[in-house]
Amino acid sequence: MNGPTSQRAKRKQGSASSLDDRPPKHQRALNGAKQQSTGDNTPEEDMYDQGLDDEDLLAQALLPSVGPDTVEWQATIQKVVSNVVSIRFCQTCSFDTDAALTSEATGFVVDAERGYILTNRHVVGSGPFWGYCIFDNHEEVDAYPVYRDPVHDFGILKFDPKAIKYMPVAALPLRPDLAKVGVEIRVVGNDAGEKLSILSGVISRLDRNAPEYGEGYSDFNTCYYQASAAASGGSSGSPVVNIDGFAVALQAGGRADGASTDYFLPLDRPLRALQCLQQGKPITRGDIQCQFLLKPFDECRRLGLAPEWEAQMRKAFPKETNLLVAEIILPEGPSSNKVEEGDVLLKVNEELITEFIRLDDILDSNVGKPVKLLLQRGGEDVEVEVDVGDLHSITPDRFVSVAGGSFHSLSYQQARLYGVACKGVYVCEATGSFRFETSDNGWILQTIDNKKVPDLETFIQVVKNIPDKARVVVTYKHLRDLHTLNTTIIYVDRHWSSKMKLAVRNDDTGLWDFTDLADALPPVPPVPRKASFIQLEHTSHPAVAELVRSFVHVTCTMPMKLDGFPKNRKWGMGLVIDAEKGLVVISRAIVPYDLCDISITIGESIVVEGKVVFLHPLQNYAIIQYDPKLVDAPVQSAKLSSEEITQGASTYFIGYNRIGRVVHTATTVTEIFAVAIPANSGAPRYRAVNVDAITVDTNLSGQCGSGVLVAPDGTVQALWLTYLGERSPSTHRDEEYHLGLATPTLLPVVKQIQQGIVPKLRMLSVEFRSIQMAQARIMGVSEEWIQQVSLANTSHHQLFMVTKRTFERDQDENSGALLEGDILLTLNDKLITRISELDIMYSHEFLGAVIVRETKELKLKLPTVAADDVETDHAVSFCGAIFHRPHQAVRQQISKLYSEVYVSARTRGSPSYQYGLAPTNFITHVNGKRTPDLKTFLAAVTAIPDNTYFRLKAVTFDSVPWVVTMKKNEHYFPTVEWIKDSSEDCGWRRVTYEGGKAMEGEPSEGVPAVEEEAGGAVDDDVPMAAVEK
């Protein structure tokens, strides 16, 4: 069913190797691929134990979670469990090493009076957090972060103790001094807030280096404890307690290779942070931008540790077997050119040092001051003075969102991971105008509009001065490959995302405060430009070669996902059908709806805006338009043939491949057939139905998503289009079919548009498929009709059967409409043996039909429905989900509409994602009140106070009713209404609802929304070398 698809926060580490403690920067991935360490590794946050079902939960229950076997342990556990809470949380947007996600974890109360809860830093996250805690008696309370450590894996949440009414709240004492090798411990955690998990183990190590989890957040410059406890998903942040009921460590991670090894964070630094909070003191954190590792004496000897120093260290610390060794020194940091990799640390401020805990103490107490380090380098003593920096100053606490992307200063975490200087502008959400290639993050900006952007302040000033709709050059590097400078051109969107917003962390409220930095500058008026076209060589038909002047490159960018469409950006080649009016025909797999920006490139030189003029409801093409006055180029109008192309006919194929290069060849039409594009069951989206498809005898046809079939005289006989199909369950990629569409079917529509008339098509609300005469005879078609079919269509002896009815609003079941299984014989006395003959329906309100139903021949008067009402013209964004009327693809696949409020998409890290409201759900009630349409739904949800629970009654696509309770969050996910309005420059206008009041325009708060379409598509639509060709 539609339960939450949250990820349980339990960090896992890969199997052991000889590189057990080496950071991944020392290993280079092959062919620039994403680094996968052969040693310690963990999936990114949004890959933790996704979508656990009942079997998964049972498997977790069967882990060795043995209960206490003594009276002492029973008493201890009974006392501890009341302090442990289950944390359900959202990291509401991508920030630093954390992706936007919804997850569950554990924490425990460490100050009952003030309401402090200790958990992991990878739970609290470095960015915006929104969550709540569930206590052992299932009382719930909101929680917000008051501290997250810049480096170590702990954070502190705050809650209101007065909100817990039905149980006493007690704190679990922190006793880091009681952690010893051989101590028996219990890891007490909550699994999904429902099942108590008590796992037993024995501490086996106190001196393990912090595990490396690969790309993403990792702890460092601390030791970890090790035990065998087999902790499971959701156990991050669990207290590790001894038999006396004291917390001796914090559960932080474990192995992912099946071993039951778990890693615990020592509590020395969490205890200090807690005491600072209790005393109202700042939590100072010092660092010299050098990562140390614990290395045993034998390895230190190989690095040059002198025997006399080893003797002195062993005498001073008889139980120690390790020393601190410099592993990574960041360029341009305090340690740069002073400390070198492989240096063995002996003293800090004349004090012998062997432990991370004491090193942290000294650095945290000397922020802004110099410290003296005594190092052994190749057997020689080296003494250096290093300035201690402020860790908080190199940990981002703000981000800027503009033009659909998000940016902040490069963090110490990222800099340490890749061994680079801790400076630069990091793209934490590479979306909107700043979508670079196929990776969503990891980019460091170098220049924008030929201006350097070394820091966030400079970035803000540069972007402020770029007008809306400008195209500017951007250079950038990826942290995994700083040797390569990438250059691209971006289209700056400051109309869909008009505000430049600064979000700053507020540790007093636990929220991130939003501020408007600048309004968008108006776009610069376009000016006419000249261009010429390439010459198509090696063709014997000059008229065919001239057709390159009829092709234009089209990029369609969608600010919001509607109608189940899986992408935010598509590109393809369009065919100019009227150069004087600037009309272009293109596949609806490229331009799916009109809430979009369209850029048209002519002659690989002139870039102009386009707009949607017409979207065909069935035949997979759209007609868009540009302003021809801006184009001074010999654009040629393609001549569309009025005669149907036939099977076996010779033709010329001109197509554009995946990188936008033209290819051409002489070929033959192999087949013309009524195509049945498979429906996408996971999330219905536009697909072509009731249309003939053409295939040709050339391998080039499968490589090209755009093109034409041309007669020798240059007449276009068919368009070559991309048809969006189903999603492959094995690869999670969207299937695309490349097929031809004969041009005669376009001519009536094109003629009306050329005359300035908006086509008002009508259609039969059914989907047909062809059947052969053997099937038709069995189903009751008479021999007389079969004979007429053989005479009417000598190339294909076929009739058409209704396979699916499209659900129409207010349609009477007994109105004479077609039913599944009906065989169509005639329409308006015309025998129908070709799919193109169905085009008669586009211009008639009623059609006289002869059909065969259940072996009986019937005459019907078939009503057609208006096709101009099938496109989405109204949408609502609420709690991170997109709602609109069920679009045509939904009605094609469903037999009953439960309401006019349909969930089309949702955003990761949002309330809709956390509480399990999934795409393809229908909303029928809000707090028990019927919401049959968007108007009543919007009125109901805007009346709900912020941060309060409400009930949604939903029905799944498979007709299963269920109820979801959600909590409203307007701060990060405001309610916005999108209304199609031709008077607006963009064709749509927005209404934002804040505190139940409506106001025009974009919301002043809210994180950048990156919608996830059902099924989790793999975005394989790689743009060309530049965003705009």
From Swiss-Prot:
Region (Disordered): 1-49, 997-1029
Keyword terms: Apoptosis, Hydrolase, Nucleus, Protease, Repeat, Serine protease
Superkingdom of source: Eukaryota
E.C. no: 3.4.21.-
Enzyme class: hydrolase
Pfam families: PDZ_1 (PF12812), Trypsin_2 (PF13365)
Region span, Serine protease: 84-274
Domain named PDZ: residues: 307-379, 845-958
Family to which the UniProt record says this protein belongs: Belongs to the peptidase S1C family.
Reported function: Nuclear serine protease which mediates apoptosis.
Protein name as catalogued: Pro-apoptotic serine protease NMA111
Gene that specifies this protein: NMA111
